[in-house]
From Swiss-Prot:
MF terms (GO), sorted A to Z: ATP binding; phosphorelay sensor kinase activity
EC number: 2.7.13.3
Main enzyme class: transferase
Keyword field: ATP-binding, Cell inner membrane, Cell membrane, Kinase, Membrane, Nucleotide-binding, Phosphoprotein, Transcription, Transcription regulation, Transferase, Transmembrane, Transmembrane helix, Two-component regulatory system, Virulence
Effect of residue 17 to A: Cannot interact with DSF. Significant decrease in EXP and EPS production, as well as in biofilm formation. Substantial attenuation in virulence
Annotated domain remarks: The N-terminal input region plays an essential role in DSF perception. DSF binds with high affinity to a 22-amino acid sensor region at the N-terminus. The response regulatory domain, but not the HPt domain, is required for repression of DSF biosynthesis.
Membrane topology: Multi-pass membrane protein
Histidine kinase domain segment(s): 195-417
Compartments where found: Cell inner membrane
Protein name per its UniProtKB record: Sensory/regulatory protein RpfC
Species whose genome carries this gene: Xanthomonas campestris pv. campestris (strain 8004)
Transmembrane spans: 23-40, 52-72, 95-115, 128-148, 152-172
Post-translational modification: Autophosphorylated. Activation may require a sequential transfer of a phosphate group from a His in the primary transmitter domain, to an Asp in the receiver domain and to a His in the secondary transmitter domain.
C-alpha cells in the first residue's frame, strides 16, 4: 500500500496561499488542548469542563472538514478563510467567557490569530480579523464574571486588541508599498539595461563589422596598429555591455543551466589559451594544477563554468603586478562512479582585498578601492557574476587571504561523471569554419588566412535578403556578405521582406528583430503562413541587439533558423551561412559551367568548383583543394565503416554529416545526398542497411573521384573551357 504523504505534498505544494498551513496549526493546537484537558481533568466532572471540551472537539471537527475541502479544491477560497477566522474567534471567545481567569492566556492566542491573518492574507483580512476578535472578546467581557470584576483590565485589553492590529496594518501597508515600489524599480532597471544594451549594440555592430572588413584590405604597419586599437576598444566595450546584461539576468533569476558532457582538462586548456598570454605580458608566472583523482570526463554547464573561471582568473591576472597566478582543481568528495564535488582555487600574489571591503566583495559594482576603477579597467561585476553563476549551478563561493600577500578565490561545484566522449579525431561539422591551425593540419582541411576567401572556397554563392531599419547595419551586412561572395538585396522593413520574397526566391534571409511597423517576429509568423500555402522554404536568421532569453526563445518558437547577437562577428555569420548553404543547397545549373564528360552527369556539380576557379587562385590550388577534400571524404567513409562495426549509430550519423559537408564542398551531388540520407535514418534502419549504404557510398565516391580527375585533367590539358549559358 502506497503512503498518502507524497500525494498530499503534491496536492498542497502548488497552492497560491498558506491557508492549509494555518489550518494545520489550528488542528495541532486544538488537539493538544483536548489531550491536555483529558489528561489533567480525567477524574473531574462539571458542566463548565464539559462545555469547554465540546467546543474544542467541535473546532477540531470543523478544522478537519476545512482541510478536506482544501485538498479537494486547492484553489484560493475566501469563504474558507472567513469560516476559519470565525471558528477561531468564536471558540476562543466562548472558552474565555466560560472559563474566566484560567482562560485569560487565550488573549495572546486571539492577538496572534489576528496578526497571522494580516500577514498571510493582507490588510483587508487584518481589519476583518480585528473586528471579529474585538466582538468575541467583548462578548467574553459581558458574560464572564471574571472579566466583569476587572473592568480596567478588560477594557484596556479590548482597546489593545483594536489598536495593535490597526497600527500593524499601517506598517503592513507601508511594507507592501515599499515592496511594490522596489519590484517596479527592479523591473524598470531591467528594462533600462535591455534598452541600453540595444542602444550600445547597434552602433557597435557598425564599428565591429566595418573593422572586420577593413582588416581584410591592404594596410601598412601604422594602419594595422590603429585598426588593432579600434578593435580592442570595441571588444572592451562589448565586454562591459555583456557583464551588465549578465548581472541583470542573474538578478532576475533567468540563468539557464545547460548540463553536457565535457572534458575538464580541455576546458581549462581553453581558459589558459586566453589568459596565459595576458599573464605573460605582465611578466607573471601562470600555472594550473588538476589533482590526479579529479575525473576528466564530467557533466555540467561548461559554458558558465568557463565564464566563472575567466572572471576569477582574469581578475587575478589584472590585479597582480608581481609573482604568480595559480588555478588549482581538487576533489572534495564523491565517488568517481557517480558524482563528485570539485573545488577550484584561484590563487594570486596581487594587491589583496582590504578588510573593510570583504563583506561587500561579491556585491555588484564593487572593487577593492574606489581608485582601482580608474587604475584597472572593469565594472566591478566579475565576482558578482561568478557568485550568481556558481550558485545557479548548485555550488558555493568564497574568499580567503593568501599569505604573505594576495588572495585566494575559491568555489565548489557538484559535478556528475560524464559519458566517454566520442572519437577524438577532428570532426569538421558541415559548413564549420575551423580557426585553430592545429586542427586544420590534423584534419587536412585547407586553411586560408582570409576568412572571406575561406568561405568562398567552401560555400557557393547565395542570394541573400537583408532587412534592418538602420542604414549603417545594412551597409555592414552588405559589405560582409558581398565580400564572402554572396548576392545581397537590402530592405529597411519587414513588409519589404515579404514583398521581395513574394516576387523572387532567396536562399536565406537576415532580419533585425526590432523594426518600426512590423517587427521581425511578426514577419516570421507571416512568412511561415505563406510557406505553408506553397511558397518555397527559406531559412531566416534573426540578428538583434536584444539578447535576452525571452527574445531568443520567442525567435525559436516563431521558426527562426538561427539567432545572432549584435555586434555580429564575421566568423560567426559566415559559419551560420555555411551551415544553411549545406542544408538548403539546390544543385541548380549555374551561369558559368565547365564541360565534363556526359558519363559523369549527376555525379559532379561542376559549378561548385567553377566558383572556386573564378576566384583566380590558379590551377595548382584547385588540384590541391580537390586532392585534400577527397582524402577527407575517404577518411569519413572509413569512419562510417568503423562506427557501423561498433554499432555506434549516433557517431555514424556524425560521420555521415561530415561526409556530406566535404562532398558538398566538391560538388559530389550523389555522395552528399547519400550522406544526408544516412544522417536521417533511425537506429533500426542503420542496423539493417548500413553495410549496403556503405557499399553504395564507396561506389559513388569512386565515380565522383573519376569525374574530378577528368575535370582536373581536362583543365590541365586545356580540353574544357568555361562557357556562359545564355
Amino acid at each position: 500500500m502506497k503512503s498518502p504523504l507524497p500525494w498530499l505534498k503534491r496536492r498542497l505544494s502548488g497552492r497560491a496561499d498558506s491557508e492549509h498551513a494555518q489550518n494545520l496549526i489550528r488542528i495541532i493546537i486544538t488537539t493538544l488542548f483536548i489531550s491536555y484537558l483529558g489528561w489533567r481533568y480525567q477524574h473531574t466532572h462539571g458542566d463548565t469542563l464539559m462545555a469547554t471540551w465540546l467546543i474544542l472537539v467541535g473546532e477540531l471537527l470543523v478544522s478537519l472538514g476545512l482541510m478536506v475541502a482544501i485538498l479537494l479544491r486547492p484553489q484560493v477560497s475566501h469563504t474558507r478563510r472567513l469560516i476559519g477566522m470565525l471558528l477561531d474567534y468564536t471558540c476562543t471567545g466562548a472558552i474565555m467567557a466560560i472559563q474566566g481567569e484560567p482562560a485569560s492566556p487565550l488573549y495572546a492566542v486571539c492577538m496572534w490569530v489576528t496578526i497571522g491573518n494580516g500577514l498571510r492574507y493582507g490588510s483587508n483580512y487584518l481589519r476583518a480579523a480585528t473586528a471579529m476578535g474585538s466582538l468575541c472578546f467583548l462578548g467574553a467581557i459581558l458574560i464572564s464574571p471574571y472579566w466583569k470584576a476587572n473592568p480596567y483590565l478588560s477594557w484596556g485589553l479590548l482597546l489593545g486588541l483594536i489598536a495593535v492590529p490597526l497600527y500593524f496594518d499601517s506598517l503592513l501597508r507601508a511594507m507592501t508599498r515599499a515592496v511594490r515600489e522596489a519590484r517596479h524599480a527592479n523591473q524598470a532597471k531591467s528594462r533600462f539595461l535591455a534598452n541600453m544594451s540595444h542602444e550600445f549594440r547597434t552602433p557597435l555592430n557598425g564599428l565591429s563589422g566595418m573593422t572586420e572588413v577593413l582588416a581584410t584590405t591592404r594596410l601598412d604597419a601604422e594602419q594595422k596598429e590603429c585598426l588593432n586599437t579600434i578593435q580592442a576598444s570595441a571588444r572592451s566595450l562589448l565586454s562591459l555591455v555583456e557583464e551588465v546584461l549578465d548581472i541583470s539576468a542573474i538578478e532576475a533569476g533567468k540563468i539557464r543551466i545547460d548540463r553536457r558532457d565535457f572534458s575538464l582538462r580541455e576546458m581549462i586548456g581553453s581558459v589558459n589559451l586566453i589568459l596565459q598570454p595576458q599573464a605573460r605580458g605582465r611578466r607573471l608566472e601562470y600555472g594550473t594544477q588538476v589533482a590526479d583523482d579529479v575525473p576528466d570526463l564530467l557533466k555540467g554547464d561548461t559554458a558558465h563554468l568557463r565564464q566563472v573561471l575567466l572572471n576569477l582568473v582574469g581578475n587575478a591576472v589584472k590585479f597582480t603586478e608581481h609573482g604568480h597566478v595559480l588555478l588549482r582543481v581538487t576533489r572534495v568528495s564523491g565517488s568517481a562512479e557517480d558524482a563528485v564535488r570539485l573545488r577550484f582555487d584561484v590563487e594570486d600574489t596581487g594587491i589583496g582585498v582590504p578588510m573593510d571591503m570583504r563583506p561587500r566583495l561579491f556585491e555588484a559594482f564593487e572593487q577593492a578601492d574606489v581608485g582601482l576603477s580608474r587604475r584597472y579597467e572593469g565594472t566591478g561585476l566579475g565576482t558578482t557574476i561568478a557568485k550568481g553563476l556558481v550558485e545557479a549551478m548548485g555550488g558555493s563561493i568564497g574568499f580567503k587571504e593568501n599569505q604573505p600577500s594576495g588572495s585566494v578565490f575559491w568555489f565548489e561545484l557538484p559535478m556528475a561523471i560524464g559519458e566517454p566522449l566520442k572519437s577524438s579525431t577532428v570532426r569538421v561539422p558541415t559548413g564549420a569554419l575551423v580557426d585553430a591551425p592545429e586542427e586544420l593540419e590534423s584534419s587536412n582541411i585547407i586553411a586560408f588566412s582570409n576568412p572571406f576567401l575561406r568561405h568562398r572556397a567552401r560555400v557557393r554563392s547565395m542570394r541573400m535578403l537583408v532587412a534592418d531599419d538602420h542604414e549603417a547595419n545594412r551597409m555592414v551586412l552588405q559589405r560582409l556578405l558581398e565580400k564572402a561572395g554572396h548576392k545581397v538585396l537590402c530592405v529597411n522593413g519587414a513588409e519589404q521582406v515579404l514583398d521581395a520574397m513574394a516576387e523572387e526566391d532567396y536562399d536565406a534571409v537576415i532580419v533585425d528583430l526590432h523594426m518600426p511597423g512590423m517587427n521581425g517576429l511578426d514577419m516570421l509568423k507571416q512568412l511561415r503562413v505563406m510557406q505553408a500555402s506553397g511558397m518555397r522554404y527559406t531559412p531566416v536568421v534573426v540578428l538583434s541587439a536584444d539578447v535576452t532569453p525571452e527574445a531568443i526563445r520567442a525567435c525559436e518558437q516563431a521558426g527562426a533558423r538561427a539567432f545572432l547577437a549584435k555586434p555580429v562577428l564575421a566568423a560567426k555569420l559566415l559559419d551560420t551561412l555555411a551551415d544553411l548553404a549545406v542544408s538548403t543547397r539546390q544543385l541548380a545549373t549555374p551561369a558559368t559551367t565547365v564541360q565534363v564528360a556526359t558519363s559523369f552527369e549527376g555525379v559532379l556539380d561542376s559549378s561548385v568548383l567553377d566558383e572556386l576557379a573564378a576566384l583566380g587562385m590558379g590551377e595548382e590550388f584547385e588540384r590541391q583543394f580537390v586532392r585534400q577534400c577527397l582524402d577527407d571524404a575517404q577518411n569519413c567513409v572509413g569512419d562510417i565503416e568503423r562506427d557501423g562495426t561498433c554499432s555506434d549509430w549516433e557517431q555514424l550519423r556524425e560521420s555521415a554529416h561530415a561526409l556530406r559537408g566535404v562532398a558538398s564542398n566538391l560538388g559530389l551531388a550523389q555522395v552528399a545526398s547519400s550522406g544526408g540520407e544516412l544522417m536521417r535514418m533511425a537506429d533500426w534502419q542503420l542496423q539493417a542497411e548500413w553495410r549496403l549504404r556503405l557499399s553504395t557510398l564507396r561506389e559513388q565516391l569512386k565515380a565522383g573521384k573519376d569525374a574530378l580527375d577528368a575535370r582536373v585533367q581536362g583543365v590541365k590539358d586545356g580540353e574544357c573551357s568555361p562557357r556562359s549559358n545564355e
